[in-house]
Swiss-Prot record:
This is Lipophilic envelope-spanning tunnel protein B. The seven MCE (Mammalian Cell Entry) domains of a single protomer of LetB resemble seven beads on a string. Six copies of this linearly configured protomer associate laterally to form a homohexameric assembly. The LetB hexamers form an elongated tube consisting of seven stacked MCE rings, each formed from the association of six identical MCE domains, with a central tunnel. Rings 1, 5, 6 and 7 are dynamic and adopt open and closed states. GO terms for cellular component: outer membrane-bounded periplasmic space; plasma membrane. The chain crosses the membrane at residues 20-40.
Amino acid sequence: MSQETPASTTEAQIKNKRRISPFWLLPFIALMIASWLIWDSYQDRGNTVTIDFMSADGIVPGRTPVRYQGVEVGTVQDISLSDDLRKIEVKVSIKSDMKDALREETQFWLVTPKASLAGVSGLDALVGGNYIGMMPGKGKEQDHFVALDTQPKYRLDNGDLMIHLQAPDLGSLNSGSLVYFRKIPVGKVYDYAINPNKQGVVIDVLIERRFTDLVKKGSRFWNVSGVDANVSISGAKVKLESLAALVNGAIAFDSPEESKPAEAEDTFGLYEDLAHSQRGVIIKLELPSGAGLTADSTPLMYQGLEVGQLTKLDLNPGGKVTGEMTVDPSVVTLLRENTRIELRNPKLSLSDANLSALLTGKTFELVPGDGEPRKEFVVVPGEKALLHEPDVLTLTLTAPESYGIDAGQPLILHGVQVGQVIDRKLTSKGVTFTVAIEPQHRELVKGDSKFVVNSRVDVKVGLDGVEFLGASASEWINGGIRILPGDKGEMKASYPLYANLEKALENSLSDLPTTTVSLSAETLPDVQAGSVVLYRKFEVGEVITVRPRANAFDIDLHIKPEYRNLLTSNSVFWAEGGAKVQLNGSGLTVQASPLSRALKGAISFDNLSGASASQRKGDKRILYASETAARAVGGQITLHAFDAGKLAVGMPIRYLGIDIGQIQTLDLITARNEVQAKAVLYPEYVQTFARGGTRFSVVTPQISAAGVEHLDTILQPYINVEPGRGNPRRDFELQEATITDSRYLDGLSIIVEAPEAGSLGIGTPVLFRGLEVGTVTGMTLGTLSDRVMIAMRISKRYQHLVRNNSVFWLASGYSLDFGLTGGVVKTGTFNQFIRGGIAFATPPGTPLAPKAQEGKHFLLQESEPKEWREWGTALPK
């Protein structure tokens, strides 16, 4: 076997290859970026120009931009003063892509926000600050410019139409004032300047591109700035295009359809207003007068719209007034043979509160008619327009005065206007009115119809205030005449005109109210014309006149028709006093009349039964000086007294607390050594109290051991009455006292005979088993003066207790019974002990004794029967 020898080995060689390190790429990249930034900065830097400004307000280096058409094209770099310190040099960097725009005619100006009533201009400057506007121009390249004071007129051709208006002055127009076509804004005032010849101004108007076709060669422009007002005594004319026009001024125009379109830079005239633009049809007018009319002011109205205007007024020989009117072409077809033009005066009306009509004064109203076209018209006064209607009813009304009624005021029937006052004439006997009633309402007027003033506002000023008497608010503002429809009689040609409804119902044409009743008074009370007439304090009329005579005064009264039913044959009149004073135990009562009645006076009346026979003097009724005197008619009585110390004039006469009369006079009768009191009873009480048996007594305070009675009479005593049942009588004796307790006034009257009065007196109680059932009403001597007659009255509810065999005795309130074995003392109440009393009882008997009759006499025992407590007699009613 053979052995192989390994081959020899070759040693490897390592070689290093040289490469550029990637790290060295970073400086290269940085160099490239720096080069690009330098180039970009160079490109952005653009061109630097200098702009001279008179003021640099709001310009900030590095912040204030330069804009063209809203695009930022540069920035302010630096601001410095010129060498002569008269201007500001602003360094501006303009982008390189705008380099070609920097030429001789390029313009710069400062844009700042401006606020006014018209609005805010330069709003973008208000948000982002002031900026410099730029308008590229032509010419050689330039890097130094002078800024304009305002925005330049010239604009690039973007489709807007620039025209020029010539006017004598600028008026209230301003840059930005709107231009209207049929109330739509279509452009604005771009700029204005004074004419080169110094005569007037030139106004540059820019019309928006979409409205340029509205401007024609024959277009007329007029000023609608602010408020066009023409104020005079005859009225005021106020025109207002819009709020913007009021604040910043405005221009309006119209264009004929057949005219050619206007071209840029065309010139037009600017008129004062629409009337001066002479756009419309001219018609001639024959006017009733020129009063209240004003050329270029008074309008022609149709259905509430102004369709024309009076443009000329002429006074012709003979005083005839003519005029010319410019009418809107849209209503020319209405101007025909039977068309009327009416002249109307403005009127205040609550139903049609057209305040603008009140300010404009008189107006013309177009009333279309048929027939052939015409351009000359006779103007009809508005108040006579109704006469031109077919089948109109005309009537004549007569009145003593005009009552404020004038031509043009309405005729009202049931609140609806049915006619109009046509004319008013003054005559020697008064005023005559011609009225017209519409054809459809003429059948409503009858022979007994009445015409009443509807516009009258009667004002009465007095101490009680101001009183307005009139129709409703709308009716007295509109005025006119009210018709009261009748139902019978043929229609008449003439009717009277009444001042108010009351006079119409009375058929009275006098200014003074009619006399309803006349009064006569011996002396004049505190009344005068205008004093009120009252019925139970309610006003029902007034005093018309007061006429003096030799020995009396005649007073005429007017009672309103609705209250005349209160007057009867029993009506009694008296003069009202200023105040009534009543002083009694409850205090001082003062009943004062209202101040107006106290100063002007008043007359009252009431109906008193039985007063008709004595309250007339001839054909006149008597006016009494006071209510007391009036109510005393036919009720005089005479009271006889021996002392007047407790009496006084005016002292009331009362029954159960109610005044039924009073004392009028006190006289001393020396022949009889007595006092005679003349008193009156009110008529309604005469028949009841002026009778025999009636007792009158003075009630005054009574102070005794038993207590104080009638304390309420300390301040004002009065006369108490106890009615009788005898025949009519007018003379009475005034008693010292009578009963005032109403429990016993209609009770049973009996007489108890006693040897002496003892401690008894009027008012001493009558007792039954200790219970008060009656009272002593009086004491007199017997016919032979041998005993005392004690009058007693038992209450009606207890009169069945008194029988023919009843026994009466003195009840002093105590008894003493002493004997050898002792004594007994019996007492009653303290009041009984002080006042005493009369007791009675009925002994038993079969059959039971009958009831005592009126006037029955009994004997009064000195002491009580010993066995009376054992009687126990049953006494049925």
